[in-house]
């Protein structure tokens, strides 16, 4: 009986020792780049469009709506970010200048911007406010 057990054990040992690791096959192209993989891991983001058309009830603006139209009285970017984070999104992308040309940040390059609106008496900067809120709450922030 011992000889039989020894023989069976020896056969299994020989079988397992003869197995060697085989290299996996080369991937079939195209293979995603590290940047593409990083992009996929970002998952869902909030894409925020908030500008002059929010206040003039138009679907499409042509750059002829006065900058004074932009006047959010209770804008709370932190509230947006808290809700976005609670919804499980990973970050926020803000349309900082839509097709109508209105800039949501103060700039000296064009007059059609937030500094020429009544929002915070012309001292507002929605890009900065949303960016700061994202940093505070640990979300990524991007601009479109």
Regions found by a protein language model. Give the residues of each.
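Bacterial Sec-dependent N-terminal signal peptides
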Residues: 1-24
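Mature catalytic domains of secreted/periplasmic carbohydrate-active enzymes
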Residues: 21-144
